[in-house]
């Protein structure tokens, strides 16, 4: 064994880290480095106030590579984590490493997870994808991303770090390298400082990023009758400042903060109708159209503005010959969709994706299906930003309170499981009490659970863990048929991979949607038009 070589490597690693990081109190006198590239200067200056130092000769050596142990130490220092000099991480290859206390600190904080085989590889140079992973976990950046982002760099497509890098790009933390993103590229000292400083400087920003994958219109207020603020916007990544339970989001535009709906309003016109360029019968007739389902982009009294192949046109609903009104029980019915956790509560940690974003994305997809296909109103108990309530216990009460306040007809809570990495499968719960003092809809809840469970098993092709009785607050305290479904285990490789996929989450949403329709069929209503 070449012990001299090993000692030399360890010494070099410790030296690099100590040169990169030093206690803030040693930086009383401001230093400047002559070799820092312009693009990294602001970041270097920023971290010098926290924990950054240079070489003994007064240089910074920006092109020097940084290893994983040094990166862990830098993250621990910038995050202000408590360092126990005696602490050991769980990784076998890092227990006796010079950076062991720092690796233990960032592991405890949930910033790192190792390579999946029980090792951390602390002396290995860190690549850009791994650096992105540290930043996303350390600053909970996934909580600032709504839905799925497009991959803008060709060299990221199919790479395990694509989703992580996409988040950094969308949040303005990274712009790539000029000729790609280079996820396997080794991080230099300058790049490490740039990554960390840019992320830390933006930590007070609570806005979200979302890719709007269709043309969209903005409005003055969260209402189609509030007035259109501009022509259609092309599909793009948008900055979201607020999201409401009814599907409206406040976004940043070049003319200030405006509103747009997550889902376009669809309305079925049952008779022949005439369209106009303005909301006035005195304006020119543009055309006559056969009965069809239209997209409504604006409302003004009895008039609605719709999208046609020839552009936006107005029609007067008062002129329509309405079909004989049927007794449609769906009108006015509200379905409460409850995506579990949220905000600071990420739920179970997943191999690929944590519970909270999985269930929120699935819930939004369910809501969209109801908005597009039925007269139902589907409301979410939380937005993408936070969980309701002051703490976990209060959050449960707020969810039930929301359901009651909005006169929910049924309540469906969506979760994902986690245990030890080996457990897998799908299960759905309902509440059954020895007395009827709590939720009295035991039989309805059971049938609803059975219908949703059956659809999910078929759609997700997961192990059927069954329909179970659960003494869960949101089921017990509700005053409507209520169920809680666990889609799968995010910490299981097979289940987690499915739940990480937008396509599989769409399958889950469609299964929940169909299961709810099945429930209403069981209740004696003809739902065939809505499947």
Curated annotation (Swiss-Prot):
Gene3D superfamilies (alphabetical): Zn-dependent exopeptidases
CC annotations in GO: extracellular region; outer membrane-bounded periplasmic space; S-layer
Molecular function GO labels: N-acetylmuramoyl-L-alanine amidase activity
All residue ranges annotated as the SLH domain in the record: 29-85, 86-149, 150-210
Pfam families: Amidase_3 (PF01520), SLH (PF00395)
Domain MurNAc-LAA positions: 335-517
Record PROSITE patterns: SLH (PS51272)
Disulfide bonds: none
Keyword flag Chaperone: no
EC class of the enzyme, as a word: hydrolase
Endpoints of the signal sequence: 1-28
UniProt keyword Repeat, yes or no: yes
Main location: secreted
CDD domains recorded: MurNAc-LAA
EC numbers, comma separated: 3.5.1.-
Single Gene Ontology BP annotation: peptidoglycan catabolic process
UniProt xrefs under InterPro entries: MurNAc-LAA_cat, N-acetylmuramoyl_amidase_3, SLH_dom
SMART domains membership: Ami_3
Keywords: Cell wall, Hydrolase, Plasmid, Repeat, S-layer, Secreted, Signal
Family of the protein in this entry: In the C-terminal section; belongs to the N-acetylmuramoyl-L-alanine amidase 3 family.
Name listed for the protein in its UniProt record: Uncharacterized cell wall amidase pXO2-42/BXB0045/GBAA_pXO2_0045
Lineage: Bacteria, Bacillati, Bacillota, Bacilli, Bacillales
């Amino acid at each position: 064994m070449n012990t001299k070589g090993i000692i030399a490597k360890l010494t070099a690693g410790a030296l690099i880290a100590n040169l990169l990081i030093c206690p803030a109190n040693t930086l009383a006198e401001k230093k400047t480095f002559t070799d820092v590239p312009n693009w990294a200067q602001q970041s270097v200056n920023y971290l010098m106030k926290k924990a950054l130092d240079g070489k003994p000769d007064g240089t910074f050596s920006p092109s020097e590579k940084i290893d994983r142990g040094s990166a862990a130490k830098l993250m621990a220092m910038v995050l202000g984590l408590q360092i126990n000099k005696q602490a050991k991480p769980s990784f076998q290859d890092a227990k006796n490493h010079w950076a062991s206390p720092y690796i233990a600190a960032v592991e405890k904080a949930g910033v790192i997870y190792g390579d999946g085989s029980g090792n951390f590889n602390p002396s290995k140079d860190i690549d850009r994808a791994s650096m992105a992973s540290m930043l996303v976990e350390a600053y909970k950046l996934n909580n600032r991303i709504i839905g799925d982002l497009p991959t803008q760099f060709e060299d990221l497509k199919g790479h395990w770090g694509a989703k992580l890098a996409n988040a950094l790009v969308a949040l303005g933390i990274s712009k790539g390298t000029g000729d790609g993103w280079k996820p396997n590229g080794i991080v230099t000292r300058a790049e490490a400082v740039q990554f960390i400083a840019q992320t830390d400087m933006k930590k007070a920003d609570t806005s979200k990023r979302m890719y709007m994958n269709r043309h969209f219109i903005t409005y003055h207020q969260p209402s189609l009758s509030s007035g259109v603020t501009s022509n259609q916007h092309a599909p793009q990544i948008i900055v979201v400042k607020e999201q409401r339970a009814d599907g409206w989001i406040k976004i940043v535009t070049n003319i200030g903060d405006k509103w747009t709906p997550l889902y376009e309003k669809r309305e079925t016109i049952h008779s022949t109708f005439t369209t106009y360029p303005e909301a006035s019968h005195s304006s020119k007739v543009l055309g006559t159209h056969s009965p069809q389902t239209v997209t409504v982009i604006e409302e003004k009294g009895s008039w609605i503005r719709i999208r046609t192949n020839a552009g936006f046109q107005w029609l007067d609903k008062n002129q329509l010959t309405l079909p004989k009104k049927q007794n449609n029980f769906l009108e006015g019915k509200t379905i409460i969709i409850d995506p579990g956790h949220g905000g600071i509560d990420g739920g179970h940690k997943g191999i690929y994706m944590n519970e909270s974003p999985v269930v929120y994305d699935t819930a939004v997809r369910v809501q969209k299906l109801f908005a597009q296909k039925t007269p139902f109103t589907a409301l979410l108990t939380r937005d993408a930003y936070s969980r309701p309530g002051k703490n976990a216990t209060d959050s449960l009460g707020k969810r039930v309170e929301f359901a009651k306040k909005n006169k929910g007809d049924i309540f469906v809570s969506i979760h994902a499981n986690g245990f030890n990495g080996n457990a897998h499968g799908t299960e759905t719960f309902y509440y059954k009490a020895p007395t009827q003092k709590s939720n009295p809809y035991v039989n309805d809840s059971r049938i609803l659970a059975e219908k949703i469970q059956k659809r999910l098993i078929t759609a997700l092709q997961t192990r059927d863990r069954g329909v179970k009785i659960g003494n869960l607050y949101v089921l017990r305290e509700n005053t409507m048929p209520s169920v809680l479904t666990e889609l799968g285990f995010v910490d299981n490789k097979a289940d987690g991979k499915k739940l990480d996929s937008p396509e599989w989450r769409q399958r889950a949403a469609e299964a929940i949607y169909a299961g709810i329709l099945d429930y209403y069929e069981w209740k004696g209503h003809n739902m065939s038009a809505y499947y």
